[in-house]
Amino acid sequence: MAGGPANWARAITGGSVVIGFGYLLLKTATPNEQQLYDSLSPDLKRRVDAQRSSQADSERSAKVKEEQSKRLV
């Protein structure tokens, strides 16, 4: 006998438990951004800081160019 409401309920419940456990495991095992940064070696921290600074500079430059182009129009 295939199918039946009991089999569907058991399958949905089992699937929900597996998905819920996987989500909980993901949330507890994955470090947040600050924890990941704190675990880096000093050399890698310097590289990350330099990259963040470069990214911030390029974003500021893009904003300035955008404002200048708006003034010209």
Swiss-Prot record:
Residue segments, region Disordered: 47-73
Cellular component, GO annotation: mitochondrial inner membrane
InterPro entries, per the entry: Cbp4
UniProt topology in membrane: Single-pass membrane protein
Subcellular localization: Mitochondrion inner membrane
Membrane-spanning segments: 11-30
The family this protein is said to belong to: Belongs to the CBP4 family.
Protein name: Assembly factor CBP4
